[in-house]
Design a protein with these regions (language model features):
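Membrane-interfacial loop-to-transmembrane alpha-helix junctions, especially the N-terminal start
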Residues: 6-15, 56-69, 153-156, 242-250, ...
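Start-transfer (signal-anchor) and selected internal transmembrane alpha helices
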Residues: 7-15, 57-69, 104-165
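Transmembrane catalytic cores of multi-pass membrane glycosyltransferases
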Residues: 19-21, 29, 33-36, 75-97, ...
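Transmembrane alpha-helices and membrane-interface helical segments
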Residues: 41-48, 115-122, 232-236, 283-287, ...
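Signature aromatic-anchored transmembrane alpha helix within multi-pass, membrane-resident enzymes
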Residues: 65-66, 72, 476-499
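Intrinsically disordered, polar/acidic, low-complexity terminal segments
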Residues: 142-193, 197, 203, 207-230, ...
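Membrane-embedded helix bundles of polyisoprenyl
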Residues: 246-265, 272-282, 299-303
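Membrane-interface transmembrane helices that cradle and orient dolichyl/undecaprenyl
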Residues: 280-296, 328-333
Length: 623
């Protein structure tokens, strides 16, 4: 008997899917218009979906997945409220209905969150079930092959434990990294400005509310758990088995302990969502052997999750696709099979990027980074210039020994790939070289293409993923031990550096507290503070790095870029601690007033700072 194309459950999924789209769209006209187009396409796709009524009912009936979807939708509903509460268009709609906007928007958010639960739950249920089915099959194949090693569950615990030990010095430092200070003081999120709506939603779940309380070290430990899961999944995807050797676990630690990701895990608030962007780039590849629609959809959702959590990870998925395509070709897969895999991956990638660009991304242009592209004629030269700048930074960041180990790890990847290939030697060498070049160009994602990009270490953790791919390939199996050594050595030096970096943060924190207390102590002697009248205090200059760290950059140039400015003028992030953490009486922080151009008399001058002031104005010049 022929299955009916339409049945009530499909209609429910259509309406629920549209509700989910409305829950995610930001308050801007272009996004809302494209959201309507996406809703029509979604309904057509669900209509044509070749699935039975019984299958849909089974997917909808799992209570755990339904609860998970409701929790996630609830976090999105909080986003929806903040996005639309000040919208004039929403206020007009509320007025037409005779309601106050303060009541109408929460009702809409709650309605869309509940209405979107069936669609979200159905998708979650399908992919969890498919993943479990593939895992059971891979586990059975691993047992039949006689492969021995550390099971996935135990491997995950080991990798997580190693990662947490690796960042223990960072956790012990209790360092407020860059915008951690204002977030801890004010509890704000404000990732929406960079269209990182998923980070905002997940933060609501992690912190148990809309106000971000300082829950460190929980977010950082959660970040390392996510990175450990990402590493194990990468090994599972590439090796196609459920057991791992000690060599393989050692090189997988590079993923979370490379110096560039240490710049991410230093954040007390942002760390889990930076780590989640890596996981979102890896998970779609679990379904690469599923039907085309399922793989393209999960790839699109994964890239959308990357772009709405931390866009620096946008190059990880295509980089892994290229590496997997090389493995497929080397193992004898036809050009057609490899090409089809790449095309499906590219389709999913484009789907996610297009939805993000047309519906979600609100143009941003700041001194930090923008999302505009240069002109078409300048795009490729601009990309190559920025790419060269990224690799120049890596060369200066890495010690000579690190550079040697990284080059040897890349060479081991190439040698292992060619030796294990079922193809002829020359074509294998050529394809490996092409793959190496492509992965090197992709590891920084879309950032090299941006007209105004960012070169901070936290934006470069894709290079750590590239090193992990090198090491994972070289360390695979039980043979050719010499090829495993460079990546294992690299994992060890990164492990050691994580302690050095954490201790350096602790030293910088102590020095910052010392210098801040000196300024406050001297300000107490200023006559302007002997009354209750407000006094405008401005900071200029910077304390720089702690003296004990001055010699370290000769050995670890990476520290120069990882340790931020902590106390000084000209940057809000270096002033929040001074103005907000010490309950300074009568002190006014007024960024609109610049005292540096005034010829204020010197009130105090010592080896650490100069204090100038007159009347209700005080300028602190840090040395």
């Amino acid at each position: 008997m022929k299955e009916k194309r339409f049945f009530p459950e499909k209609g429910l999924l259509m309406l629920s899917g549209v509700a989910f789209l409305l829950l995610t769209v930001p308050a801007w006209v272009q996004g809302f218009v494209w959201c309507g187009v996406a809703a029509v396409l979604l309904c057509v796709a669900v209509w044509r979906l070749p699935v039975s009524q019984q299958k849909v009912r089974a997917l909808l009936s799992n209570p755990a997945h339904a609860a998970l979807s409701l929790a996630f939708n609830g976090a999105l509903a909080v986003n929806f409220y903040h996005i639309w509460i000040d919208s004039q268009k929403m206020q007009r709609v509320a007025g037409w209905l005779g309601m106050e906007n303060g009541l109408f928007v929460p009702l809409c958010a709650a309605f869309f969150a509940i209405a979107a639960a069936p669609a979200a739950g159905c998708v979650i249920s399908y992919y969890i079930s498919a993943g479990q089915e593939d895992y059971r099959r891979t586990k059975a194949e691993t047992l039949r092959s006689g492969e021995t090693g550390i099971p996935m569950g135990k491997a995950l615990l080991i990798l997580f434990a190693v990662s947490v030990v690796g960042i223990s010095a960072i956790l012990r430092a209790n360092f407020y990294y860059m915008d951690d200070s204002p977030r801890a003081a004010l509890g704000y999120k404000q990732w929406d400005y960079f269209s990182r709506y998923l980070s905002t939603a997940l933060a609501t779940l992690v912190h148990g509310g809309d106000y971000l309380v300082d829950a460190a070290p929980l977010p950082q430990m959660l970040a390392m758990l996510i990175m450990a899961v990402s590493g194990i999944l990468m090994g599972y995807i590439f090796c196609e088995r459920t057991t791992f050797s000690g060599w393989e676990l050692a090189v997988l630690s590079i993923l979370g302990l490379n110096p560039y990701f240490l710049g991410c895990v230093s954040f007390r608030f942002d760390a889990p969502y930076m780590a989640f962007s890596v996981l979102a780039a890896v998970v779609p590849l679990l379904y690469r052997n599923r039907n085309t629609a399922a793989y393209v959809l999960v790839s699109g959702l994964g890239i959308l999750a990357v772009c709405t959590s931390y866009q620096a990870a946008a190059g990880i998925f295509p980089m892994l696709v290229v590496a997997l395509a090389l493995r497929m070709w080397n193992r004898g897969k036809s050009i057609r099979e490899v090409g089809l895999f790449c095309l499906k991956s590219a389709a999913g990638y484009a789907l996610g990027l297009l939805f993000f660009k047309l519906v979600i991304m609100i143009p941003a242009d700041t001194n930090y980074v923008g999302n505009a592209l240069p002109s078409a004629g300048e795009l490729i030269p601009h990309f190559m210039r920025n790419l060269r700048s990224y690799y120049s930074l890596i060369l200066s960041d890495f010690k000579p020994f690190w550079r040697i180990a990284a080059v040897l790890a890349a060479a081991a990847f190439c040698i292992r790939t060619v030796l294990d290939s079922r193809r002829r030697t020359l074509p294998a060498i050529a394809m490996t070289a092409v793959t190496l070049i492509l992965m090197g160009m992709m590891c920084f994602g879309l950032y090299p293409a941006l007209a105004s990009t960012v070169f901070a270490p936290r934006a470069m953790y894709g290079f750590g993923v590239l090193l992990t791919v090198f090491g994972m390939t070289a360390a695979e199996g039980k043979t050719r031990v010499p090829l495993k050594i460079p990546a294992v050595v690299l994992s060890w030096v990164f492990f050691v550096f994580s302690f050095t970096y954490g201790n350096a943060l602790s030293v910088q924190k102590d020095y910052t507290d010392f210098r801040t207390q000196l300024v406050i102590s001297d300000l107490q002697e200023v006559e302007a503070f002997r009354s209750d009248a407000p006094v405008t205090v401005q900071l200029s200059g910077s304390i720089g790095k702690a003296p004990v760290l001055w010699n370290m950059p000769q050995n670890y140039q990476m520290l120069n870029r990882l340790i931020p400015d902590t106390f000084g003028g000209g940057d809000d992030l270096t002033q929040y601690g001074f103005y907000c953490y010490y309950d300074l009486q009568n002190v006014v922080w007024n960024p609109d007033v610049d005292l540096r151009g005034m010829d204020l008399p010197v009130l105090e001058d010592n080896m650490y700072h100069t204090i100038r002031g007159e009347g209700s104005y005080v300028l602190v010049e840090l040395k």
